[in-house]
Amino acid sequence: MFERDEHHFPVKRLLLLGALVGAGAYYLSREQNRKALDAKLAELGLKDAAQDVGSSVTKGWEKTKDAAQNAGSVIADKAQDVAGEVKSAVAGATAEIKDAGKEVADTAKDAGQNVGQNVKREAADLADQAKDKAQDVKADVSKAADQAKDKAQDVAQNVQAGAQQAAANVKDKVQDVKADASKAADQAKDKAQDVAQNVKQGAQQAASDAKDKVQDVKADASRAADQAKDKAQDVAQNVKQSAQDAKTDVDAKAKSWAFDLRTDAEAGKQGGQTGSTTNNAGTAGNTGMTGNTNTRKN
């Protein structure tokens, strides 16, 4: 009866399901597959996400393997316990029946009917105990199988959730990479526009500075020309003033010389009139001329 019930319980299917899930996780966690996946994702800049996927798959495989091992161990232990308990129950029942038979043989002479009833009652009790024990064992086996089934389902759900989470992480990583690339492109565009604007402003500022410099040079040249003109006028004025001063000095000296000559002439004339002889007068005249000459020289 126990073997038939055990065949009807889908333990093998659960083990097969666990083996399939474990095989799938193991296939995804193989070194060469991980390397190929890492190489491909490294080209896309998603190596960290791939490592997360590999880690999730590896953890799922470990959980699946542990659950399968635990389920197998529980079922094997429970089967051994059931076999031991059934064997003990049968051996106990046999021993008790044998003992009861001996007691019946010993007491048959005194109370045959009572012994028969006692033996029948004992046999019924033993049968009921064996039946109850078998039902308890069956319930324990069913409970252990249900626990193993629930454990396998939990592991499968965890593996599926881990795979979905890893896929979502990869998708989010791709979106982040695309967003970063778009942001970098926008920043580069803005930077180029800023550089162009700075260059344009620099050129305009340089042109304005050059224009201002030309205006400054023109102003300096005009100011220098005005200063040169003023300097020339000052020099001309000084020359004119010097010429006028020289002319004034010459006129003054000429007037002084004329006055001296006139004075000397008058003095000579007076000297000639007072002389006693013509020679003396001539001498005086000569002397006067000499004096006038000396005066002019002076």
From Swiss-Prot:
Positions of region (Disordered): 174-298
Keywords tagged on the record: Repeat
Biased composition (Low complexity): 194-208, 275-298
Biased composition regions of type Basic and acidic residues, renumbered to the chain: 174-193, 209-233
SUPFAM superfamilies assigned: Apolipoprotein A-I
Gene Ontology MF, one: protein folding chaperone
Residue stretches of each LEA-like repeat: 48-117, 128-197, 201-270
Top-rank taxon: Bacteria
Coiled coil: none
Family under the similarity heading: Belongs to the LEA type 1 family.
This protein's name: Protein DR_1172
